[in-house]
């Protein structure tokens, strides 16, 4: 994990040092959770951009995601959860098939990410502004879509040391989110880029994907 050579310069020092983690097998969602799925589970849609059911759900806090996951698990009998940060970055990098790309699936950010300058229009209220339907750009090496861009993705926790199956501290003030969003620059779409905020934060750039 961390800012390996292909990531280039970053002012975000906490992407370093590069360190090794060991993960057990897990599953991660091919796409961000869509508004269609959220509505089916929760019965309402908190999102700001609602023109297409295949848009990622947004305006969801980390705590909202936990409520959704609890309800989904009751309905399905599964044990879905948010990915840990280590799981998220491993998947974004392409797992064991990684080609060491700067972004999730390419060194050309326009191939794989919806971000500020790639949105068809940057004027609020006009077509193309905001989130875009999932899986409309190229996937990464694992067949995962939008690991770079579209909406930020909440992680369960964070980690900083070499360890096996890191889940980060058991308590703290902030939660990690990764991947960049439609409202930010390509720099934020790098697979090593990290960010954090309060778990109560929600806006039209914040979404998530599931792990199992």
Locate each region found by the language model.
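A generic secondary-structure signal marking the coil-to-beta-strand transition
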Residues: 17-19, 24-25, 130, 173, ...
């Amino acid at each position: 994990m961390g800012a390996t050579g292909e990531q280039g310069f970053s002012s975000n020092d906490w992407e370093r040092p590069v360190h090794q983690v060991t993960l057990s097998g897990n599953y991660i969602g091919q796409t961000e959770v869509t508004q269609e799925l959220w509505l089916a589970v929760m019965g309402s849609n908190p999102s700001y951009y609602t023109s297409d059911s295949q848009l990622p759900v947004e305006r969801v806090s980390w705590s909202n995601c936990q409520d959704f996951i609890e309800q989904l698990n009751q309905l399905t009998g599964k044990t879905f959860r948010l990915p840990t940060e280590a799981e998220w970055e491993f998947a974004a990098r392409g797992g064991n098939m990684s080609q060491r790309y700067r972004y999730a699936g390419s060194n050309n950010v326009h191939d794989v990410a919806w971000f500020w300058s790639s949105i068809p229009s940057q004027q609020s209220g006009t077509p193309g502004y905001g989130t875009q339907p999932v899986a409309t750009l190229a996937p990464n090496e694992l067949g995962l879509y939008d690991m770079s861009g579209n909406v930020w993705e909440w992680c369960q926790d964070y980690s900083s040391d070499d360890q096996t199956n890191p889940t980060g501290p058991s308590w703290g003030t902030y939660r990690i989110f990764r991947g960049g969003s439609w409202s930010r620059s390509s720099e934020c779409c790098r697979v090593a880029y990290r960010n954090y905020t309060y778990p109560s934060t929600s806006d039209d750039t914040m979404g998530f994907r599931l792990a199992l």
